[in-house]
Design a protein with these regions (language model features):
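Helix-start/capping segments and mature chain N-termini
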Residues: 2-20, 32-33, 38-175, 196, ...
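Short linear motifs centered on serine/threonine within intrinsically disordered regions
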Residues: 28-29
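Non-catalytic, conformational "gating/processing" segments within enzyme and secreted inhibitor domains
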Residues: 178-181, 186-208
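Intrinsically disordered, low-complexity, serine/threonine- and charge-rich segments
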Residues: 24-25
Length: 416
């Protein structure tokens, strides 16, 4: 294989190509990855050949005893990620024998060696998705195959084992079904699912792990922001960078989030709610907090444009982002662009009265309206929620209608 270097492991092959190709090919790895032995390019020259996946049909279940069952908090007291359901899912992997049998067990602390790779080199990834209870009492997942695609891409980039996404979806349906009473009976709330994979090999060598653990925990959640559906204010400071070319900004790795916490605290000390991440000398917009960002412009002559940064390796390919773009293109009422957006363009649009709306998009909050951006000595005011029918609100309502089953849509996947 010219120009690449391959390392063969019993479980998969990872190949490194030139990380800065002149015209990089980007393909989406299917969520059904493990039924083929073909090598597939996934992103930025990284390739993965998966081993045989775990099987949902081999699931073992250990139910909680009555004394292990937890008291469920009132919906009004739910805080994001603080309470957890009665059960969890675990699947172990090692390089010699591959994936083990999936197990659903009572929720418990993890035990691992202090030299585990995850603790020293951040060999880790996670996903975020939700289960929703509709008025018909049916519980649904939202586009779970997209999370599986992204999880497999991140696994390959992290030198962690890939798997058959369809099998994990079946396991997610099963554990949600077992803990279904934890899915809130309220349309402002949902059950948050956190699939996670960590390298557990107990050695300090800087190399691919030969042992790993995939686990899933679940948490009932209310609205992500305590302020409700109200515009937030952002800190945009170009000296802080979240991601860079050739890096892993497009991957769902914990190492992308830990370094942002101190900057988030800086914003909060200034009375702001989130950080608007910029990149490069042009101060290009990338993400807001842990969300994708979208901007609605008035282009004049009755034309409007919904713009969002492109998937160029600096931002996460969000499921909500993809869903909003798909809806907007289906509506066909305004131009939809995936392109670079600079702060100079934002400043100019605001001065000309052409900056209509700015909002974040992500699983936790769906959409989050932005009312102001603090950028240097400027405070850019955005009338996101001041219009008679804000696009932000329309997106929020449209996604919620699908998630809670009020509108029938193939994105909504019943658990049974």
């Amino acid at each position: 294989m010219s120009g690449t270097h391959g390392i063969m492991l019993p479980a998969f092959v990872v190949e490194w190509a030139n990380p800065f190709p002149s015209s990089p090919a980007r393909k989406t790895i299917p969520y059904l990855t493990s039924r083929t032995t073909e090598t597939q390019e996934i992103s930025h020259g990284v390739r993965c050949m998966s081993a045989q996946s775990f099987k949902a049909s081999e699931l073992q279940i250990e139910f909680c005893t009555p004394d292990q069952l937890k008291q469920k908090p009132p919906v009004s007291e739910l805080v994001f990620g603080r309470n957890f359901t009665d059960h969890m899912l675990e699947i172990y992997w090692n390089a010699s024998s591959g994936w083990g049998q999936p197990r659903i067990t009572p929720f418990h602390d993890l035990r691992m060696h202090p030299a585990a790779k995850v603790l020293h080199y951040s060999v880790e990834l996670f996903e975020g998705m939700k289960a929703f209870r509709g008025n018909d009492d049916e519980i649904r997942l939202f586009r779970p195959e997209k999370n599986m695609e992204r999880m497999n891409r991140t696994a390959a980039r992290s030198s962690l084992p890939t798997f058959d996404g369809a099998e994990l979806i079946e396991l997610l349906k099963k554990i949600v079904s077992i803990d279904q009473e934890w899915v809130p009976h309220a349309e402002s709330s949902s059950l948050y699912l956190r699939p996670t994979m960590i390298g557990t090999e107990p050695t300090l060598g800087v190399q691919e792990p030969t042992e790993a653990l995939l686990f899933v925990i679940m948490s009932p959640v209310g609205p992500y922001f305590s302020s409700g559906f109200k515009p937030v204010s952002l800190l945009a400071d170009p000296k802080f960078v979240r991601a860079w070319p050739g890096g892993c900004g497009m991957m769902k790795m914990g190492s992308n989030y830990g370094p942002t916490l101190a900057i988030q605290k800086t914003a909060e000390r200034q009375g702001l709610q989130q950080v608007l991440w910029l990149f490069g000398p042009e101060h290009r917009i990338t993400e807001v907090g842990a969300m994708n960002l979208m901007v609605f412009f008035d282009k004049g002559n009755g034309e409007k444009e919904l713009a969002t940064p492109p998937l160029d390796g600096l931002i996460l390919p969000g499921v909500t982002r993809d869903s909003l773009l798909s809806l907007a293109r289906e509506w066909n009422e305004f131009t939809v662009s995936e392109r670079d957006i600079t702060m100079a363009e934002i400043v100019q649009a605001e001065s000309e009265g052409k900056l209509l709306e700015v909002f974040g998009a992500g699983t936790a909050a769906v959409v989050t309206p932005v009312g102001a951006i603090h950028y240097g000595d400027k405070i850019i005011k955005i009338p996101t929620m001041e219009h008679e029918k804000p696009l932000t609100q329309r997106f929020f309502d449209s996604i919620k209608d699908i998630q809670y089953g009020r509108v029938k849509h193939p994105w909504s996947v019943p658990i049974e």
